């Protein structure tokens, strides 16, 4: 063989090999077929683990995703939290721990698909359900309704989400197989026009080819169900699974079934005991669903921590949530496998196509012990107040252009002749 031709052949082969290594993944497809999801035309059961990237320090993302894969999951499900990305109106941040696109790419690197739930409302025991505080500066705003200003701001946010994540849909070679429209809206109101507008905004943001769905409870999913969206149910451990899907199967007898939130535990409120749910009920529920080819997302598989002021509150009344979002999940707050994890892993192994599940990764960081300490100094609460102002009534945070933190109120009460009780009702942010 001519030596020059031989060298050209080797170089061409190497260049071709390098190009195949660096080329983007070819586009695929994920659709709703007859009684099953179809991944590139083949039946597919979604086994999703709910993780929230803002509740996990970025250096630990990879270990948490690997933990989910070792549990037998094939998909990561996540919310996109509007208020952490747009803390000031018009200023978007998708960097550092907010880099949701990097989180999705990391999931793909670990062989996982992704379900994206971009709200605009997400609940999740998160500050204002993910809605930015500055929306309330407009006093007549109607949140989660067809309010022109609200929808305009939703459109701007979802457009930014699209810039980050639309290139990562499965049709573009990425891991995103499904995108959710709104969130459990049936438990909030009845307004198909509003839900339709959110659907249109999501589509216009670049999610026009990916499978779109909406989630609700069995008791209210018909309130706002749109004909062109996939419908999924949310329910917890101990539920009668056939009963949860009964009405849906009557309306859509050939639709693939999915529990988009199967609650592994529950959240904790200030002053209450730590919520716990038995592993047996969770494992039996997942076993039953998988035996019937019902897809699911385990909410939460790992809860993490609501850092800073991001923990939300529940109503009626005022029931603030603690910063720990442990949720009694199979992977605890600091990323370790719990007894629930090991029990569920045994069941998930049965549905892994005869292949051995990946090894469970080591913890991302050791648990440290903080020694006892004595506090010897203090500071007055009103020291260093930066925005003193006088008002005839109590001003809200939004009226003071504040999103988080603490506000110190002081007043002089009139002198009274006899003792009385002073009540401050509903005084909270």
Residue positions per predicted region:
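Bacterial N-terminal signal peptides
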Residues: 10-20
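Conserved residues at the C-terminal ends of beta-strands
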Residues: 50-52, 79, 182, 302
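Substrate-binding/catalytic cleft of secreted carbohydrate-active enzymes
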Residues: 116, 120-153, 159-298
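Carbohydrate-binding surfaces of carbohydrate-active enzymes
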Residues: 151-180, 186, 191-195, 199, ...
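Bacterial N-terminal signal peptides that target proteins for export
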Residues: 1-11
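Aromatic-lined substrate-binding rim segments of carbohydrate-active enzymes
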Residues: 61-127, 199-210
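N-terminal carbohydrate-binding accessory modules
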Residues: 24-75, 105, 109-111
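Aromatic- and acidic-residue-enriched carbohydrate-binding clefts of CAZyme catalytic domains
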Residues: 79-91, 96, 124-149, 316-328
């Amino acid at each position: 063989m001519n030596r020059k031709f031989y060298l050209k052949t080797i170089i061409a082969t190497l260049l071709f090999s390098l190009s195949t290594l660096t080329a983007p993944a070819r586009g695929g497809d994920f659709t709703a077929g007859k009684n099953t999801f179809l991944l590139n035309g083949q039946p597919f059961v979604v086994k999703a683990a709910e993780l929230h990237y803002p509740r996990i320090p970025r250096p630990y993302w990879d270990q948490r995703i690997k933990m989910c894969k070792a549990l037998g999951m094939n998909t990561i499900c996540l919310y996109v939290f509007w208020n952490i990305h747009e803390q000031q109106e018009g200023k978007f941040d998708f960097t550092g721990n907010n880099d949701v696109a990097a989180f999705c790419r990391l999931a793909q690197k670990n062989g996982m698909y992704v379900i994206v739930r971009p709200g605009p409302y997400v609940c999740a025991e998160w500050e204002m359900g993910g809605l930015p505080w500055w929306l309330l500066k407009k006093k007549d705003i109607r949140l989660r309704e067809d309010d022109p200003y609200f929808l305009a701001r939703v459109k701007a946010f979802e457009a930014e989400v699209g810039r980050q994540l639309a290139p990562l849909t499965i049709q573009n070679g990425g891991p995103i197989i499904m995108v959710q429209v709104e969130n459990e809206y049936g438990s909030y109101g009845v307004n198909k026009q509003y839900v339709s507008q959110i659907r249109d905004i999501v589509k216009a943001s670049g999610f026009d080819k990916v499978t779109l769905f909406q989630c609700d409870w069995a008791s209210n999913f018909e309130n706002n169900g749109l004909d062109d969206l996939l419908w999924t149910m949310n329910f917890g451990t101990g539920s009668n699974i056939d009963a949860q899907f009964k009405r849906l199967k009557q309306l859509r007898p050939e639709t693939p079934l999915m529990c988009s939130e199967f609650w592994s535990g529950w959240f904790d409120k200030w002053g209450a005991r730590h919520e716990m749910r038995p592993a047996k009920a969770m494992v039996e529920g997942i076993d039953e669903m998988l035996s019937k080819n019902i897809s699911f997302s385990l909410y939460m598989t790992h809860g993490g921590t609501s850092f800073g002021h991001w923990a939300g509150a529940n109503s009626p009344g005022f029931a603030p949530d603690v910063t720990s979002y442990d949720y009694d999940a199979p992977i605890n707050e600091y990323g370790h496998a719990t007894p629930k994890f090991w029990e569920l892993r045994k069941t998930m192994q049965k549905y892994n196509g005869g292949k051995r599940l990946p090894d469970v990764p080591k913890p991302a960081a050791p648990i440290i012990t903080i020694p006892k300490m004595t506090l010897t100094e203090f500071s007055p609460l009103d020291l260093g107040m930066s925005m003193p102002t006088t008002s005839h009534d109590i001003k809200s945070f939004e009226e003071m252009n504040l999103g988080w933190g603490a506000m110190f109120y002081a007043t002089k009460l009139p002198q009274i002749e006899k003792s009385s009780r002073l009540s401050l009702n509903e005084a909270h942010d």
